[in-house]
């Protein structure tokens, strides 16, 4: 496990963008995103995610958009795992101890599976390079699949129905590879899964 502060995420395409805090007697102002920063990208949608301690979000992998994560409060463990066969870091994993005081953002490209375990109550803000669509957010696997190689914290896990019912790591990899190859049947399966997500 590594600390995010001043760290490099050893997965191809995953960038850490440190913010520069500007503290004064009132508190602190710091920029969380600038399109001109090295490793940054254009975003079209921003979301805020409020999570309680013990919540797990993931494991998810996106097929057509990049995410920009920044932790505004609290602490979490971020696990990332590369499932892109053409990547120099294919099959590699890292678990990151991420704290709001690190004042850093993490870029997660398509094909990198990821999950967040919230050790404390936390607020996560994240930007997307394309608008979110449920049918393109249905690829994932169980958070505790040993093939991921994540260092999983102890404690009660609170998951969505979707995440608790996710399949295996191998199923996730097959779905991802079929989708990026243009398999129309997989797209239909994902659309059906999206309906289940919306109903959950």
Indicate where each model-derived feature is located:
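Beta-strand residues in well-ordered beta-sheet regions across diverse protein folds
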Residues: 71-72, 79-81, 107, 117, ...
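Non-catalytic, conserved peripheral segments adjacent to functional cores
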Residues: 1-101, 131-200
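Short conserved catalytic/interaction loops centered on acidic-Pro-aromatic/His motifs
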Residues: 113-141
